[in-house]
């Protein structure tokens, strides 16, 4: 079982239950899924860029990415409807817990000048979004094997009903929030 999932069951869930006065154990906030997205705008001109991004994403998450296509044509960006413009992976279950553990304990501390993640990136419904400037912070990515440095978006979807519950859940799981 994932180390973080164990910690959730042993320490985090009971603490959340007590803090928010939750009686029903099924109402305790937990992680639902983590969506990792990599937008590759250059893929419109060069399809090899998308292959590199998909390879990186597969290495980081341990799961095959899904190609995301443009929903509509935008002449200014030279994009036609249906052109591949990015890659996405939805993580659930064990892989989700393993990924979050690696993100918190290995990847984020490797970010240059890291002072913590923004405590304001909640969406009002208990979900957290985080942007990473370069994929090189993940230990699975070797600096020499990368064709270009790309950023990625990470959306952490929780069952929490409020931002306060979600913030407390992530804080107890070890998410390093920047002090306000």
UniProtKB/Swiss-Prot annotation:
One of its GO terms (cellular component) is ribosome. Part of the 50S ribosomal subunit; part of the 5S rRNA/L5/L18/L25 subcomplex. Contacts the 5S rRNA and the P site tRNA. Forms a bridge to the 30S subunit in the 70S ribosome. This is one of the proteins that bind and probably mediate the attachment of the 5S RNA into the large ribosomal subunit, where it forms part of the central protuberance. In the 70S ribosome it contacts protein S13 of the 30S subunit (bridge B1b), connecting the 2 subunits; this bridge is implicated in subunit movement. Contacts the P site tRNA; the 5S rRNA and some of its associated proteins might help stabilize positioning of ribosome-bound tRNAs. One of its GO terms (biological process) is translation. This is Large ribosomal subunit protein uL5. It comes from the Bacteria. The lineage of its organism: Bacteria, Bacillati, Actinomycetota, Rubrobacteria, Rubrobacterales. GO terms for molecular function: rRNA binding; structural constituent of ribosome; tRNA binding. Belongs to the universal ribosomal protein uL5 family. Keywords: Ribonucleoprotein, Ribosomal protein, RNA-binding, rRNA-binding, tRNA-binding. The gene is rplE.
């Amino acid at each position: 079982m994932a180390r973080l999932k164990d910690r959730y069951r042993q320490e985090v869930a009971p603490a959340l239950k007590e803090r928010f006065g939750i009686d029903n154990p099924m109402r305790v906030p937990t992680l639902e899924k983590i969506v990792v997205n990599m937008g590759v705008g250059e893929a419109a001109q060069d399809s090899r860029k998308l292959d590199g991004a998909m390879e990186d994403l597969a290495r980081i998450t341990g799961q095959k990415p899904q190609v995301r296509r443009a929903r509509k044509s935008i002449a200014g960006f030279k994009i036609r409807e249906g052109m591949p413009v990015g890659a996405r992976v939805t993580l659930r279950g064990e892989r989700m817990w393993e990924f979050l553990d690696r993100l918190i304990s290995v990847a984020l501390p490797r970010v240059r000048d890291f002072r913590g993640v923004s405590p304001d990136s909640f969406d009002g419904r208990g979900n957290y979004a985080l942007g990473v400037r370069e994929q090189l912070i993940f230990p699975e990515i070797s600096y020499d094997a990368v064709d270009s440095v790309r950023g990625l978006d990470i959306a952490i979807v929780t069952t929490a009903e409020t931002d306060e519950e979600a913030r407390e859940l992530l804080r107890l799981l070890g998410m390093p929030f920047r002090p306000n």
